[in-house]
Swiss-Prot record:
SUPFAM superfamilies: P-loop containing nucleoside triphosphate hydrolases. It comes from Dictyostelium discoideum (Social amoeba). Keywords: ATP-binding, Cell cycle, Cell division, Coiled coil, Cytoplasm, Cytoskeleton, Microtubule, Mitosis, Motor protein, Nucleotide-binding, Transport. PANTHER family: CENTROMERE PROTEIN E, KINESIN MOTOR DOMAIN-CONTAINING PROTEIN. This is Kinesin-related protein 10. Residues 417-503, 726-802, 891-971, 1134-1156, 1191-1238 are annotated as: Disordered. Residues 16-374 form the Kinesin motor domain. Residues 437-464, 1191-1203, 1229-1238 have a biased composition (Polar residues). The lineage of its organism: Eukaryota, Amoebozoa, Evosea, Eumycetozoa, Dictyostelia. GO terms for molecular function: ATP binding; ATP hydrolysis activity; microtubule binding; microtubule motor activity; plus-end-directed microtubule motor activity. It is found in: Cytoplasm, Cytoskeleton. One of its GO terms (biological process) is cytoplasmic microtubule organization. ATP binds at G116, A117, S118, G119, A120, G121, K122, T123.
């Protein structure tokens, strides 16, 4: 049959492989096993979800040992068609193979193969069963012969073969030898290729069925010969691959020169097996090995074909573009035409929905997904008629003509007998049937073997050659016989109608009962799920409340309410226990309903197999119920996932804020350590790593300054007035900067030396040297030119100061701000040292944090200070801690009376802006001015006017130098603080707030050095005095005066301050820093050089007796204060690197008497700070130097105030944490009296 010349010139078309998935119903053992769950959920006709995260049954474990340790995979797969557990054999056939039958008859090749693991339902799909009905093979042959019978214009020859591949050997299943397919007596067949490179199997038998019944008998016989053995996973496991090949030859009766040829291959593959799961040994193990080998080769071919098709689509070239490993197995060689030939292929992937077959199902879905990308070229097979075939047909025609003549003679004899005798009706009826169907009368006669389908041609040709006279005789005969047949049929119909009625009534009753059961199961399950959802929500609320109560119970602030907390905790525990009991009962009922639905999937088709219409109705109802339950589960899951996502988002946000806050403290410590030459290489490396981690934490941390510069919001706020004059040094008397737009960028190195400089920027076209991008800044030396981000400085009206959110800084400048920045500073760095600006976080709108990351070891002197003024009221919003790198050109006044001169130095240093906090409110308001030499930290408290009202603005005047030996003074930071009513809100430790009567402190400019030393001596001598009026109820733990910066509270928390009336005073360490500063201020023109201890070398013949006495006095006071050597070891301190003191504009002298008690812990702490080599030494040392020890003041009856230092207040906008405490560091009693001096 294959020796035909192929003259096919038809066009070829590309067609993708059709991939479908069928999910089998679960077995009884799988349903009863509580450890196994359903892991496949059908969404619609084209999509399924593998291993879903079901809420009611929990996430299933996708590992081999069924351990609930891994999260569900939840992979979504889309195929050409997905059949759920309710799908019938007819439904699968109609949506897969039915269209292929007409496709094959028209002269094309097609193949259908079932792929899957052992026990997944492949044989059930292809062959069928007694209870479930026939499979695809049987239904396909029925459809084929029905189409052939309907087509009267063509002649057809149908042939079939049935073989198996067992242990890599090919066996014929239709042979008549005894033993069957598994017997060794069967002949092993060989594969070969013909001249057209088509696969041919030698000695394979071909049968020529003439009806579907003959095909059923042949299939039944072949399946009995097929090798099957029971295994651990399947009692009727197929141990071989079965291939049913059907060829159809078509010849047009009008044009007999054209013959089309079509081939349909139906393949039932054996299932892949896992030896550890099947527990096979001996022959079963050998069979499983061969099966897995051939399936692996098939999988490799599918994978290679998929990659080849992808490369062809993308026009890419692979290493082996044309190599497909067909020869790895005999199965792949047989399926070569089906995979890559001119063939339309349909793959039916059979999977199990149970979790016991997790890996097998997952692998099957992956191979099916790959097979979707395979494309084949489809060509119609049309052959020219050969001479041998024509002669064969001529012989058939001759035989048919002879038969026609014989039949005509018989017909004549029969008609003559009918005229003679009218009583032989039975004989006439037989003659009628023989004359009507020609070849049926000769059905028992043998037919010559190369032409088995002759009966089909004979039936068709007989109809064409019949005479008209015969037709008339037959019509008369039909009228006589119809009366007899009708009478007999009426009697049979009456009996059958009564039986059918009874059957229909019982069937309808069963249908109604099953429909009610499905509906009741759906309603009951939905009610239980809704109740379960409500109880889960209630349980979460109670658990959250329980956690908050446990935190309150651990806090010392709620000792009085412990009884109520314990009572409420017990109530919540009992409620949670009841909810858990109710949930367990609900889960049991849900499991019972789920088991009933799973059983229904397999029992439904068995009960109503004889009534397909009723079966379809019930299947639709069951699918609708399943879809409703899935929709409810998905809705609940979406709600649950959304709540979890919001919770995680808030946690991530708080963690980011905490990390940014902690890194801000670390950057401050780095600044102080590098300024004092205490930073080690390990610390610098760790600091760089932490900076990179913070920078790469999230893209949301990085601010797009292009957007910020174009969207700078001007916020009118009467409560905040912050002025920073750091970037532009204007030596002016009147400097009016009117910036009506926020997109004005100024040059960092801009020095305006004009007396009147009016800058009116009313448009957006101000182009400067600065770009609004996060560009790293490289500083190779101290004189490196860096273009940094500028600020938009405005000059609002005196009544309504405005707050500008500009780029990375919040700038608000009050009216008539006349200032002159004259500072002394120097920066020294190694020649290879560099610094980069790293953007680490977005604390609030328009704020950015930048730090200097040194790559090599950097040594520098003390930082340069900005001039700032702050005005805060009771409605002040919280703001965040920022550390901003600024490039400044400072004017250094390095002049004497004889040699006046100035220097300009480019300096890059981080300027720390301290965090906002809500301040306690009072009925009266005071104004205080604070200054700091190192960071923006309070140093002094200045008295206010008698009106106790805040000034609308402050004036920062240049320092008036009354002493020739005084050097350039650092600019002063003034803070106008309007104090509202007292409320228990924490105050940062760097802010000093008097409550009712402000404490007048001496101004450095109004006192000479002797008066300063006298007052400081009095403070140090009285520090051992005890405070008898100390209120112990307001005290806190004082064993830890110094706190590591990373142990401080994150910005989103706030601690309540007890008692409500608070005041912050300076610590002993701050006082010591003041003594050291005074020593530097008094002698910085004499080229001082600091030694390792507190002894200073003032040079030769440059120190007067008076200064020497003062120096000794300072040293003794310092050592008395701390009882330890000074921790700051500065080497080679130059005159331009000294710390300048802050000068107040109001000469006020105050006599102060202070009694201070310093615990011994302070001394030990400083020892550990100085001599320890721990990695946190720098941070602790920074805390000691830069932070002012806070104190709490409580009014006393003796008109004295108790100072209680505590740990730095927590930053940010969070709720109060009851578990945190404010720890005191020392107790100080201050008696003050004011004396105003002109």
């Amino acid at each position: 049959m294959n020796n035909n010349n192929n003259n096919n010139n038809n066009k070829t078309t590309m067609n993708s492989m059709i991939v479908t998935v069928r999910i089998r119903p679960e077995s009884q053992s799988e349903i009863l096993n509580k450890n196994c769950k359903t892991i496949v959920r059908v969404i619609d006709d084209n999509m399924l979800v593998f291993d879903p995260n079901d809420i009611d049954i929990g996430a299933f474990n996708n590992n081999r040992n069924n351990k609930q340790s891994q999260q569900p995979v939840e992979q979504k797969y889309i195929f050409d068609r997905v059949f759920d557990q309710y799908a019938t054999q007819e439904e699968v056939f109609e949506n897969t193979t039915k269209e292929l039958v007409s496709y094959v008859i028209s002269g094309h090749n097609a193949s259908v193969f079932a792929y899957g693991a052992s026990g997944a339902g492949k044989t059930h799909t292809m062959v069928g069963g007694i209870n479930t009905g026939p499979g695809i093979m049987v239904l396909t042959m029925k459809e084929l012969f029905s189409l052939i019978e309907k087509d009267r214009s063509n002649q057809y020859i149908v042939s079939m073969s049935y073989l198996e591949v067992y242990n890599e050997t090919i066996r014929d299943l239709l042979i008549t030898n005894t033993g069957g397919g598994g017997n060794s007596n069967n002949k092993v067949l060989e594969l070969c290729e013909d001249e057209n490179k088509q696969i041919v199997i030698r000695d394979l038998s071909w049968e020529y069925p003439t009806s579907a019944d003959q095909v059923f008998k042949l299939l039944k016989y072949g399946n009995l010969n097929r090798k099957q053995s029971p295994t651990q996973t399947n009692q009727t496991s197929s141990r071989s691959h079965a291939v049913l090949q059907i060829t159809v030859k078509q010849q047009n009766l009008q044009d007999k020169s054209k013959i089309s040829f079509g081939k349909l291959s139906l393949i039932d593959l054996a299932g892949s097996e896992r030896a550890s799961k099947t527990l096979n040994t001996g022959d079963r193990l050998k069979e499983g090995t061969s099966i897995n080998k051939s399936l692996l080769a098939l999988g490799n071919c599918i994978k290679a074909l998929g990659e080849l098709c992808k490369n062809q689509q993308s026009q890419q070239q692979s290493s082996n573009p044309n190599f497909i490993p067909y020869r790895d197995s005999k199965l792949t060689r047989i399926l070569k035409d089906s995979l890559t030939g001119s063939c339309k292929t349909i793959m039916i992937a059979n999977i199990s929905p149970n979790s016991s077959s997790f890996e097998e199902t997952h692998n099957t879905l992956k191979y099916a997904q790959r097979a979707k990308s395979i494309k084949t070229q489809i060509t119609k097979n049309v052959f020219a008629s050969s001479t041998n075939l024509i002669t064969q047909y001529n012989e058939i025609i001759k035989e048919q003509r002879e038969e026609i003549k014989q039949l005509k003679l018989k017909l004549i004899q029969a008609t003559s007998n009918n005229n003679n005798s009218n009583n032989n009706n039975n004989n006439n009826n037989n003659n009628y049937f023989s004359n009507s169907f020609g070849s049926c009368g000769n059905k028992n006669q043998p037919i010559k073997q190369p032409t088995p389908p002759t009966s089909l041609f004979h039936q068709q040709n007989q109809k064409y050659y019949r005479n008209d006279d015969d037709d008339d005789d037959d019509n008369d005969q039909e009228e006589n016989n119809d009366e007899v047949l009708i009478n007999e049929d009426d009697e049979e119909v009456d009996g059958e109608d009564s039986n059918n009625r009874d059957n229909d009534e019982s069937m309808i009753q069963q249908l109604e009962e099953m429909s009610l059961l499905i509906n009741s199961n759906l309603q009951d399950t939905l009610t239980l799920k809704k109740t379960q959802s409500i109880q889960r929500q209630r349980k979460r609320e109670l658990e959250n409340e329980l956690k908050s109560l446990e935190k309150q119970q651990q806090s010392i602030l709620n000792e009085n309410n412990n009884v109520d907390i314990i009572k409420r905790t017990n109530e919540i525990g009992s409620q949670i226990l009841k909810i858990k009991t109710l949930e367990s009962s609900i889960n049991e009922k849900l499991e019972m309903n789920n088991q009933w639905r799973r059983k229904l999937q397999s029992e439904l088709t068995l009960k109503f197999v004889n009534s397909p219409k009723n079966l379809k109705i019930l299947i639709q109802q069951a699918r609708a119920a399943t879809l409703e339950l899935d929709r409810f589960d998905l809705t609940e899951r979406m709600i649950d996932d959304r709540s979890k996502l919001n919770l995680k988002t808030n946690e991530c946000k708080s963690l980011k804020d905490s990390l940014s806050w902690m890194f801000g403290i670390l950057s401050d410590g780095f600044k102080l350590l590098t300024e004092n030459n205490l930073a080690t290489d390990d610390f610098l490396k760790d600091f760089l790593k932490s900076g990179d981690l913070i920078n790469n934490l999230d893209n949301s941390f990085i601010i797009n300054e292009n957007n910020d510069s174009n969207n700078n919001n001007i916020i009118e706020n009467d409560d905040i007035d912050l002025s920073f004059n750091n970037d532009i040094n204007n030596n002016n008397n009147n400097n009016n900067n009117n910036n009506n737009n926020n997109n004005n960028n100024n040059n960092n190195n801009n020095n305006n030396n004009n007396n009147n400089n009016n800058n009116n920027n009313n448009n957006n076209n101000n182009n400067n040297n600065n770009n609004n991008n996060n560009v790293p800044l490289n500083c190779n030396n101290s004189n490196s030119n860096i273009n940094n981000k500028n600020q938009n400085i405005i000059n609002p009206s005196p009544l309504k100061p405005r707050r500008i959110m500009s780029g990375s800084n919040n700038i608000i400048k009050s009216t008539n701000s006349n200032s002159r920045m004259t500072s002394t500073a120097t920066t020294t760095a190694a020649s290879t040292a560099t610094a980069t600006t790293t953007t680490i976080g977005k604390e609030k709108k328009g704020e950015i944090r930048s730090i200097v990351n040194p790559i090599n070891k950097i040594s520098s002197s003390t930082s340069l200070l900005p001039s700032s003024s702050t005005k805060i009221s009771n409605t002040t919003p919280l703001y965040s801690r920022t550390s901003i790198l600024r490039k400044r050109t400072l004017e250094i006044d390095d002049s004497t009376d004889s040699n006046p001169r100035t220097k300009k130095i480019n300096v890059s240093s981080p300027v720390v802006t301290k965090p906002k906090q809500l301040l306690p409110s009072t009925t009266t308001a005071t104004t205080t001015t604070l200054s700091s030499p190192l960071v923006n930290k309070p140093k002094q408290i200045l008295p206010t006017t008698s009106s106790l009202q805040p000034k609308p603005h402050t004036k920062i005047q240049p320092h008036k130098n009354n002493n020739n030996n005084n050097n350039n003074i650092a600019p002063q930071m003034n803070m106008n603080i309007q104090i509202p009513n007292p409320i228990p809100i924490p105050i940062p430790m760097h802010v000093q707030i008097p409550i009712s009567n402000p404490i007048p402190m001496p101004s450095p400019s109004s006192m000479n050095l002797k008066e300063k030393l006298d007052s400081l001596s009095q403070l140090c001598n009285n520090r051992s005095a005890k405070n008898e009026n100390y209120n112990h109820n307001n005290s806190f733990n004082s064993q830890n005066p110094f706190v590591h910066p990373l142990q401080m509270h994150p910005p989103q928390l706030q601690l309540p301050l007890h008692p409500p009336q608070t005041m912050i005073m300076q610590s002993n360490m701050d006082l010591k820093m003041k003594l050291d500063s005074l020593s530097f201020f008094n002698n910085n023109n004499n080229n001082h050089q600091a030694q390792n201890d507190l002894s200073f070398d003032y040079g030769q013949n440059t120190l007067s007796n008076e200064n020497l006495i003062l120096h000794n006095k300072i040293a003794s006071l310092s050592s008395t204060l701390i009882n330890q050597p000074h921790p700051m070891r500065v080497k080679k301190l130059t005159p331009t690197s000294t710390i300048s003191s802050s000068i107040s504009t109001r000469p006020i002298t105050t006599s102060t008497t202070t009694s201070t008690t310093v615990p011994s812990v302070v001394s030990n702490r400083i020892k550990s700070l100085v001599h320890s080599n721990s990695p946190i030494k720098e941070n602790l040392y920074k805390e000691k130097l830069s932070s002012t020890a806070s104190a709490t003041l409580t009014p006393n009856r003796n008109n004295s105030q108790i100072v209680q230092p505590f740990k730095r207040g927590v930053l940010g906008n969070g709720p109060t944490s009851s578990s945190s405490r404010l720890l005191p560091s020392s107790r100080t009693t201050v008696n003050t009296s004011r004396k105003i001096i002109k």
